[in-house]
């Protein structure tokens, strides 16, 4: 069972994601809304995957959270944002555009888990999904 931390400033969206993930066999290690809370929860609960909103409740950016994580052994990171062209996303594996469908969030997490485990991303990719690591070996891209 993969452990996921949700970092999202919109509590309704965070609750929706938590319910969806639990229904599909994930363990949700918590919900964070700020940079400090996210980093502390990641270090304490060591999630396998992080759903990381770009804009956080404290005005910070999700990229600031990702930058604080050590590369070896860091969790897989799926950014979620309403404006994918707004900021250069770094230190993550993929990005999913908001609003997203349940099926797209689940598939996006599955792909990020595959990247962490194998270094490869296997299509099909969800609607509004973008790989962020050019070194990722994608079977059909």
Task: Map each language-model feature to its residues.
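Acidic di-acidic motifs
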Residues: 8-9, 125
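Two-component/phosphorelay signaling modules centered on CheY-like receiver
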Residues: 10-30
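Acidic, metal-coordinating helix/loop segments flanking the phosphotransfer/catalytic sites
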Residues: 18, 31-49
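Active-site residues of response regulator receiver
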Residues: 53-54
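Short amphipathic alpha-helix used as the core "switch/output" element in two-component signaling
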Residues: 60-75
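Hydrophobic/aromatic residues positioned on beta-strands within the core alpha/beta folds
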Residues: 80-81
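A Lys-centered signature of the CheY-like receiver
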Residues: 98
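CheY-like receiver
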Residues: 107, 114-141
